[in-house]
UniProtKB/Swiss-Prot annotation:
InterPro entries registered for this protein in UniProt: Antimicrobial_frog_1
Record's function text: Antibacterial activity against Gram-negative bacterium E.coli.
Family label: Belongs to the frog skin active peptide (FSAP) family. Brevinin subfamily.
Tissue localization of expression: Expressed by the skin glands.
GO BP terms: defense response to bacterium
Keywords from the UniProt entry: Amphibian defense peptide, Antibiotic, Antimicrobial, Disulfide bond, Secreted
Official protein name in the record: Brevinin-1Sc
Predominant location category: secreted
UniProt subcellular location: Secreted
Lineage: superkingdom: Eukaryota
Paired cysteines (S-S): C18-C24
Length: 24
């Protein structure tokens, strides 16, 4: 499990959370 993969996954989760909660 590489840090780069974790970073990308984190950004994806952030974007999903932003889209769902409308808190950007």
């Amino acid at each position: 499990f590489f840090p780069i993969v974790a970073g990308v996954a984190g950004q994806v989760l952030k974007k999903i959370y932003c889209t769902i909660s409308k808190k950007c």
